[in-house]
């Protein structure tokens, strides 16, 4: 009898070991699957972010990324590597055990926030669920059904859906105007106000009048000009008028010596306030409507309104 008990005990032990081994194999296979589906950043050629309100599609040709809806859009190339790294991290994240019937507990039963990542002809689509206590996020891969814990830093890619494609626009870098490189500045405003400043032997003049000291703050302001946002790329007919750019509050034509030692011009047209402390502007002959901080245009707007006293 003892012999039979020993044999049964051995069989039970073997069965338990087999079951444990099977579970380990399952976990190993899931981990291997995640590793196999990890997409390298350099191989990623397309990203598609979507939610209930919009879809953002990006594709890469050679080394250049494009917004698929309009390939002429000035997409900020410097912003794309961070997005690609975040997408790659998502594909490489480790799986966690979540039963199909428990998906709702992790916010994964009916989520509409997704990211599709394509590399070498293979696409993986991730749906965002709830945030874990660790700060990571539960993500479900549609292609293999795995649920993965993805770092909060990687999941920040979805913040793009809180704004618009204009947040991804490359903004023009304006020249730095200084007392040394300024050649002339013509400022025009309402009521036929027109101020022509020219530099003669290092002295700024309006007619024969020396206005070097009176225009010092203006020159400093011109040297700090920068656009802060893209408001409307390729605006429709009438958009400029809505922004007050058909009858601008100020327009400046500045000539200066560029880094190559040749003469260049900067034309800045300032429209109406945007309601959030900024001004609608256009730069040179580009019809794109940009935004500038109103505080960076105080001297220019004052000169355009009152002239040089």
Cite the ranges covered by each PLM segment:
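Soluble, acidic/polar mature domains that operate outside membranes
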Residues: 2-309
């Amino acid at each position: 009898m003892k012999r039979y008990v020993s044999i049964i005990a051995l069989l039970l032990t073997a069965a338990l070991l087999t079951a444990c081994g099977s579970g380990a194999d399952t976990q190993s296979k899931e981990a291997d699957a995640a590793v196999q589906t990890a997409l390298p950043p350099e191989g990623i050629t397309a990203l598609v972010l979507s939610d209930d309100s919009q879809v953002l599609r990006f594709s890469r040709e050679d080394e250049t990324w494009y917004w698929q809806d309009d390939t002429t859009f000035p997409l900020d190339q410097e912003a794309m590597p961070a997005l690609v790294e975040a997408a790659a991290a998502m594909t490489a994240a480790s799986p966690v055990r979540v039963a199909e019937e428990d998906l709702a507990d992790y916010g994964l039963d009916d989520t509409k926030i997704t990211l599709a990542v394509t590399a070498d002809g293979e696409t993986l689509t991730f749906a965002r669920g709830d945030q874990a206590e660790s700060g990571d996020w539960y993500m479900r891969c549609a292609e293999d059904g795995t649920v993965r814990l993805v770092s909060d830093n990687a999941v920040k890619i979805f913040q793009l859906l809180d704004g618009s494609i204009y947040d991804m626009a490359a903004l023009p870098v304006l020249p730095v105007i200084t007392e040394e490189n300024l050649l002339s500045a013509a400022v025009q405003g309402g009521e036929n106000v027109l101020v022509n400043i020219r530099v003669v032997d290092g002295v700024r003049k309006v007619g024969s009048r020396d206005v070097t000291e009176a225009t010092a703050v203006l020159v400093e302001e011109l040297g700090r000009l920068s656009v802060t946002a893209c408001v409307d790329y390729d605006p429709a007919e009438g958009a400029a008028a809505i922004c007050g750019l058909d009858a601008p509050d100020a327009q400046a034509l500045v000539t200066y010596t560029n880094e190559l030692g040749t003469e260049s011009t900067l034309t800045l047209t300032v429209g109406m306030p945007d309601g959030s402390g900024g001004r609608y502007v256009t730069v040179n002959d580009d019809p794109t409507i940009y935004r500038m901080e109103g505080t960076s245009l105080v001297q220019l707007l004052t000169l355009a309104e009152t002239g040089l006293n």
